[in-house]
Regions:
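Second-shell loop/turn segments in exported
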Residues: 32-36, 81, 180-192, 239-240, ...
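N-terminal low-complexity, Pro/Thr/Ser-rich intrinsically disordered segments
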Residues: 134-163, 319-322, 331-332, 338
Length: 342
C-alpha cells in the first residue's frame, strides 16, 4: 500500500474523456471498463507503485472529500496517450471536475483539409494549443508527469492555506541540493540530476564564449530552479496543476528580454541549442513564449529538424531515434502539469 503522510497527497495526472472518445482513441476494451467508480491507469504509473487491476485509489475531490475508485485496467502508455489516470465523465463529476478544456477530433478524411479549416476558423494561434498525433518530435516538448516521476521521483505535497506548497521532507532531502553552479546561485536548490546537466550546459556555454548571453542578475534574483507552486483549477479547489519547478526541474535566466509572453525572446539561439544538447527543452517555443525557461527532459534535444517558431535546430539527425516515442503516445501526457509555467 502506498500512503501519503497525513495531510499530504500524491500528484496524479488525470485525463477525462467521454466513452465514445475513449472507444475511438484507445479501443472499446478500454472504454468498456470505465464507470463512475472504475478508472484506468497507465502502465508506467502502475509500475512506479506496484499497482494492478483491482487495487483501490483514493482521490481528493474539489471540495476536499476523499473518494475511492477501483483500477479496472492497466494499459500501455502508448494506448493511454501518456496520462496516469483515465476517468469517465461520470467519475469526474463525482470529483467536482466539470470544466471542459479540450476538444479531440478523429475520423476526418484529410489532414490537409483539417489544417485548412483550423486556419479558416482562426484556431491556429498562441492562445490555443493544437496537437496532432502525426506531428514530428518537437525538441521543446516537455516530460509528462509519469515520465517526470520515473526520472526525478515522486513526492507527496500539501497546498497550504496561503497558497504555498509544502513537499514531503524525505523526497526533498534526497533529491534537492542548494549551492551555486558558477555564477548561478540557485539558493533555493535544484534536483540533483538537473544540477549535473545544468553544470554541463553552463560549462559549454562558457567554453563557447557565450557566457554574456546569460543574465546572472535576473537568474539570481527573479529566476530559480526549485520553487514549489500550485495553480488551482478554481479558487479554494484541491484540484489544479503543479509547476515543474516543484521538482527542481527547470531554471529561469533572462527574465526581462525573454519573459513569459515576450516574442520574440532575446535568448541567443546558440545558447538555446547548447542547453538542448544537454537535455533541456526551451520555453521560447511554448504556446505562450517563455524564453527564460529551460526545462530538464534528460535527453538530447539539439538533434532533428523541426519547424520551431524560434531557434530551430540546425542538426538534421533524427530526434525520433533518440526519443523512441511518438506524439500519439504522449498526446495526454501533459495533463496534470501546468504547461508553460515559469
Amino acid at each position: 500500500m502506498q500512503q501519503a503522510p497525513s495531510g499530504y497527497s500524491y500528484p496524479m495526472a488525470t485525463t477525462v474523456l467521454p466513452a465514445h472518445a475513449v472507444a475511438n482513441l484507445m479501443g472499446n476494451d478500454v472504454a468498456a471498463v470505465l464507470t463512475a467508480t472504475d478508472i484506468v491507469m497507465g502502465q508506467l504509473t502502475a509500475e512506479l507503485r506496484g499497482a494492478r487491476a483491482g487495487d483501490v485509489v483514493d482521490l481528493v475531490a474539489s471540495n476536499g472529500a476523499v473518494l475511492q475508485f477501483t483500477i479496472a485496467k492497466v494499459v500501455p502508455d502508448e494506448i493511454s496517450g501518456g496520462t496516469e489516470l483515465l476517468l469517465s465523465i461520470e467519475a469526474a463529476e463525482r470529483l467536482g471536475v466539470t470544466r471542459e478544456s479540450r476538444m479531440v477530433l478523429w475520423g476526418f478524411d484529410s489532414r490537409a483539409s483539417l489544417d485548412a479549416e483550423l486556419i479558416r476558423q482562426n484556431l491556429i494561434s498562441t492562445s490555443i494549443r493544437v496537437r496532432r498525433s502525426w506531428d514530428p518530435p518537437d525538441p521543446d516538448a516537455t516530460l509528462g508527469m509519469a515520465q517526470t516521476k520515473a526520472a526525478l521521483g515522486e513526492f507527496a505535497y500539501r497546498v497550504n492555506t496561503n497558497g504555498s506548497v509544502s513537499i514531503d521532507s524525505t523526497w526533498k532531502n534526497a533529491n534537492i541540493s542548494a549551492g551555486s553552479i558558477g555564477q548561478l546561485s540557485l539558493r533555493s536548490g535544484c534536483h540533483n540530476l538537473v544540477r549535473a546537466a545544468l553544470t554541463n550546459a553552463m560549462n559549454e556555454v562558457i567554453a563557447s564564449g557565450l557566457e554574456y548571453t546569460i543574465n546572472y542578475f535576473h537568474a539570481n534574483t527573479a529566476g530559480g530552479c526549485y520553487v514549489p507552486r500550485f495553480n488551482r483549477l478554481t479558487p479554494n479547489s484541491s484540484i489544479g496543476f503543479l509547476s515543474r519547478h516543484t521538482w527542481g526541474q527547470a531554471v529561469d535566466t533572462n527574465t526581462v528580454g525573454s519573459c513569459q509572453g515576450c516574442a520574440p525572446p532575446d535568448m541567443d539561439c546558440r545558447t538555446v541549442r547548447i542547453f538542448r544538447k544537454h537535455g533541456f527543452a526551451w520555453g521560447g517555443n511554448f504556446l505562450t513564449p517563455d524564453g527564460m525557461h529551460f526545462e530538464w527532459v534528460g535527453k538530447r534535444r539539439d538533434v532533428g529538424l523541426y519547424p520551431s517558431r524560434y531557434c530551430g535546430n540546425t542538426n538534421a539527425g533524427s530526434l525520433a531515434a533518440l526519443d523512441g516515442e511518438s506524439e500519439r503516445s504522449t498526446i495526454f501526457a501533459d495533463d496534470g502539469l501546468y504547461v508553460g509555467d515559469h
